[in-house]
């Protein structure tokens, strides 16, 4: 029998603004507590990360500000699109994230939603905010790297 290839987790949505506005210090994988209609909407890709962030309340982590559009064929069991959703993390991970946010002034942002072995996972990042000056430096550095790669390809 042939070996099965490992599939890379398929992405549902990316938070492109997070990569632009923040510098990631550390990333983690978290599960989400979702309702059935939310899962069906996510399978269709009906999600918006625009104002999403992670909030800590009473020893739990909550995903706030993410919009999962209502599922078309749901009927009366429709979910609320903008409700806060609980993140599934170990207690020590929550404590570590919460302490680093309070002490170092970092923030926790959602980066990517994806399927992993049939479950929906959220990649979150402990991040430091970038100011306009840092973003411009990053763009310059990327342009220089692209130009050098182009010149090396010509030789």
Swiss-Prot record:
The keyword Cytoplasm applies. Pfam families: SmpB. Keywords: Cytoplasm, RNA-binding. It is found in: Cytoplasm. GO terms for biological process: trans-translation. GO terms for molecular function: RNA binding. InterPro entries: SmpB (IPR023620), SsrA-bd_prot (IPR000037), SsrA-bd_prot_CS (IPR020081). One of its GO terms (cellular component) is cytosol. SUPFAM superfamilies: Small protein B (SmpB). Belongs to the SmpB family. NCBIfam families: PRK05422.1, smpB. Required for rescue of stalled ribosomes mediated by trans-translation. Binds to transfer-messenger RNA (tmRNA), required for stable association of tmRNA with ribosomes. tmRNA and SmpB together mimic tRNA shape, replacing the anticodon stem-loop with SmpB. tmRNA is encoded by the ssrA gene; the 2 termini fold to resemble tRNA(Ala) and it encodes a 'tag peptide', a short internal open reading frame. During trans-translation Ala-aminoacylated tmRNA acts like a tRNA, entering the A-site of stalled ribosomes, displacing the stalled mRNA. This is SsrA-binding protein. It comes from Maridesulfovibrio salexigens (strain ATCC 14822 / DSM 2638 / NCIMB 8403 / VKM B-1763) (Desulfovibrio salexigens).
